């Protein structure tokens, strides 16, 4: 099975995020599942790994293009920053963003105490995943277009076919608009439910997917309802995927670090699941006619040669 290149970026200056990332990638199953590309400074990786006993190899490479299987590939971000300062880089984007744009990596996972709302601003679609629940954000300005994007993402990337979906909103304005679009898409929508009441009564257990029309309120309620609430997935207009481990907001005391690691691992697994799901979906929806044409043509040519 194909192994995808997943870029992982610990927050700059956050040794805890970097240490957690290194510990996660040292687990043997990670390099069996994917090709991890760690964007971090060589100095920090070597310092934090000092004294670690691990069978996982960390290989320092100049770029993600050279990343290979059976090891953790480290792209030295301090070197990339020096080259950018020297004017050797045409793009002002961070190296990991450039690699995602150019197809050198298949997905990106950003680790650390980032403002997820700010990071996902302008994304084409945003989905939150916890252990059992899935919540997608739907903008009010262009409901029909937003619903179509979300339903397509759920079916293509997360294998939700005709899910039972609950609309949570603090008003039923525009209800006729989204009901008409849902009927056109063949989606099963229920609601709208008041956001806070919906989560207080744990009604999310009765549905496969939550569609949130009031993102700010819904995000807070979703996070509080989840035990270790998992992952935020954002897709841009070109279909590129970035995931954010969304650390538990509940005080966990000494267990906080372990729950954060669970969230990070879930983000890595989710990245692979999304890419595999997308490939399977695209393969199933690709017309077989071009392939048949070339196969038949080759058969005819072979027959003529004989």
Can you say where each PLM-predicted feature lies in the sequence?
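Anion-binding alpha/beta catalytic cores of soluble intermediary-metabolism enzymes, centered on
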Residues: 1-306
């Amino acid at each position: 099975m194909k192994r995808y290149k997943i870029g992982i970026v610990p927050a700059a200056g956050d040794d805890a995020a970097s240490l957690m990332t290194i510990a996660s990638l040292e687990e043997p199953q990670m390099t069996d599942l994917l090709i991890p590309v760690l964007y971090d400074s060589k100095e920090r990786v070597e310092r934090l790994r000092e004294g670690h006993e691990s069978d996982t190899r960390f290989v320092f490479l100049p770029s993600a293009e050279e990343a290979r299987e059976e090891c953790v590939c480290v792209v030295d971000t301090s070197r990339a920053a020096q080259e950018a300062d020297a004017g050797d880089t045409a793009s002002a984007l961070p190296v990991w963003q450039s690699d995602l744009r150019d197809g050198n990596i298949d997905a990106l996972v950003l680790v650390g105490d980032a403002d997820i709302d700010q990071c996902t601003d302008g994304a084409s679609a945003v989905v939150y995943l916890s252990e059992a629940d899935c919540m997608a954000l739907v903008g009010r300005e262009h409901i029909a277009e937003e619903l179509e994007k979300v339903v397509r993402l759920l079916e293509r990337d997360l294998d939700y076919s005709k899910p039972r979906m609950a609309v949570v909103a603090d008003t039923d304005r525009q209800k006729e608009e989204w009901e008409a679009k849902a009927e056109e898409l063949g989606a099963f929508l229920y609601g709208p439910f008041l956001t806070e009441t919906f989560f207080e009564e744990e009604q999310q257990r009765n549905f496969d997917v939550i569609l949130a029309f009031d993102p700010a309120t819904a995000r807070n309620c979703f996070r509080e309802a989840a035990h270790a609430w998992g992952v935020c997935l954002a897709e841009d207009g070109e279909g590129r995927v970035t995931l954010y481990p969304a650390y538990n907001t509940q005080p966990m005391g000494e267990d906080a670090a372990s729950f954060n690691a669970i969230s990070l691992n879930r983000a890595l697994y989710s990245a692979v699941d999304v890419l595999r799901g997308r490939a399977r979906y695209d393969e199933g929806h690709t017309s077989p006619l071009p392939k048949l044409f070339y196969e038949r043509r080759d058969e005819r040519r072979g027959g003529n040669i004989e």
